[in-house]
Regions:
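Glycine- and acidic/polar-rich repeat regions and solenoidal domains
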Residues: 1-196
Length: 196
């Protein structure tokens, strides 16, 4: 599933399982950033809510992290290119490559989710003001990942010789003043566990 500029959208009490098991290419000239191999990806959106859902890939072989980006699906839920004030709360993720991916966004709340047996649990990459709290992550190779990449201020690519020049501007994020920097992160009261 994908959503672009679908402001004030709520996905609630759904079950996502084994989507795109054939690994069809989904990112082309017509279907852009919001089309990718994941259970759901949203872009350029304000006030998106993903609540009370189940993302279940338990029929797949266990995700060990060695197959981090090549297994079926790169993420359970993926907020990218300017999700503003998204809420990803009270969901259950089973055997996902990455359960929750918060990328170049602002003000995302990731709370009260259960993540079981995944390659990565929660990944926050170059997003500002994210709040990660009250999540339970078990038997997951990379429970919480924080990343800062080279992109800033809505610019996907800068000129190699003059970094002041943006060669690939993402207009939505730039117009909203998003920094695309990992700043203002609050992370507390999460439980990370494993079994022997």
């Amino acid at each position: 599933a994908g959503a672009n500029r679908a402001h004030n959208t709520t996905f609630e009490n759904n079950i996502f399982t084994e989507n795109n098991a054939a690994n069809y290419l989904t990112n082309g000239s017509v279907c852009l950033a919001w089309c990718t191999v994941s259970e759901i990806k949203v872009t350029h959106i304000e006030n998106f809510t993903f609540r009370g859902n189940v993302v279940d890939n338990s029929k797949n072989p266990a995700s060990t992290g060695n197959d981090y980006y090549v297994r079926n699906g790169t993420a359970g839920v993926w907020c990218d290119e300017g999700c503003i004030k998204a809420k990803i709360v009270n969901n259950f993720f089973i055997n996902t490559t990455t359960a929750i991916f918060d990328e170049v966004s602002d003000g995302t709340i990731i709370a009260s989710n259960i993540i079981e047996g995944s390659g990565a649990g929660i990944s926050v990459s170059s997003s500002s003001n994210s709040k990660v709290y009250n999540n339970t992550i078990s038997r997951t190779n990379r429970p919480i990942m924080l990343n800062e990449d080279a992109r800033t201020n809505g610019c996907n690519e800068r000129d190699a010789h003059n970094p002041q020049i943006c060669k690939s501007l993402e207009p939505w994020s730039a117009s909203k003043g998003l920094s695309w920097n990992l700043t203002g992160l609050e992370m507390y009261n999460n439980i990370i566990s494993s079994r022997a």
